[in-house]
Amino acid sequence: MGADMQPDYARLPEVDQQSCDGFVSSEFLPTRRDRRKGILYLVWFVFGVASGALLLKMLQDLPLLMTLDSSEAKLQSLLWMPTEIVVFQPNDLFASIPSPTSDRAWDELLGPSRGFVNFENPEEELGLPPGRPVPDDPKSAVYGISMFHQLHCLIMIREIYYGILLGEYNTTMFHVEMDNADGGADKDNHEHEHDRSGKAFKIKHTKHCFDYLQQSIRCAGLMQVEMPQGPDRNIFDGYGSPHVCKRWDITVFMEEHRVIEE
């Protein structure tokens, strides 16, 4: 750019020092660092007030917490189990048709306890309603654990399902047994109630299992995200996805409270 194109600048007029006497000196103006400190102090103040309010609320609720039934707290503590992350993977053993090996695998899920536990002084110590009496031990009672009840139901449904497919239950037999299980015309129906190995009892119990399992699944309400599988990502089988699961310390608990059959 040529010299003749240079812009002209005019000198600003000098300011009379006395005209600035009404302004605050810059040494008294807050710096950026001071403003940061002020914001930090404000944050800590708000945090302190919130913490104090929370502490006060806890102290106010303390009498209520202390009056909480200690037996209920003891029961919750007794039943608490640690969790772990488990990635579900296919298990052909449990997906296979009945065989001595697969049947044994399913049966072993119930363990020696078969899903029942024995508690001493359950009504006084744990706040439980009366359980099944234990012979020769009036202070103890037997209760069931829901996870094993659910497994028992799956085992029962599996038996009926494959029994129908393999011809152990023919269609006519199935409908007759279903009528009997519903309280049909069979006059010996009440006797079937006591035959827990009979087909009538198993069919009736399986009907109960469908209802019990749907309630159990909805009660657990697991909200863990499952990723799609397959080349087109359109298969949702639950495999390959992490799930938060109870650790199998449960088996130790069941053994410690195992019902000893005489």
Curated annotation (Swiss-Prot):
Membrane topology: Single-pass membrane protein
Motif (HXXHC 1): 149-153
Enzyme class: oxidoreductase
Record field: transmembrane: 39-59
Glycosylation (residues): 170
Enzyme Commission (EC) number: 1.-.-.-
MF (Gene Ontology): oxidoreductase activity
GO cellular component, one term: membrane
Sequence motif HXXHC 2, residues: 205-209
Deleted gene: phenotype: Abolishes the formation of phomopsin A and leads to the accumulation of a deoxy derivative of phomopsin A.
Subcellular location, record wording: Membrane
Span of the signal peptide: none
UniProt cross-references to Pfam families, sorted A to Z: UstYa (PF11807)
Pathway involvement of the protein, from the record: Mycotoxin biosynthesis
Main subcellular localisation: membrane
Biological process according to GO: mycotoxin biosynthetic process
Keywords: Glycoprotein, Membrane, Oxidoreductase, Transmembrane, Transmembrane helix, Virulence
Listed InterPro entries: UstYa-like
Entry domain remark: The 2 HXXHC motifs are conserved in ustYa family proteins and might form active sites.
Role, per record: UstYa family oxidase; part of the gene cluster that mediates the biosynthesis of the phomopsins, a group of hexapeptide mycotoxins which infects lupins and causes lupinosis disease in livestock. Within the pathway, phomYa catalyzes the hydroxylation of C-beta of Tyr. The pathway starts with the processing of the precursor phomA by several endopeptidases including kexin proteases as well as the cluster-specific S41 family peptidase phomP1 and the oligopeptidase phomG to produce 10 identical copies of the hexapeptide Tyr-Val-Ile-Pro-Ile-Asp.
Family designation: Belongs to the ustYa family.
PANTHER family hit by this protein: TAT PATHWAY SIGNAL SEQUENCE (PTHR33365:SF11), YALI0B05434P (PTHR33365)
Protein name: UstYa family oxidase phomYa
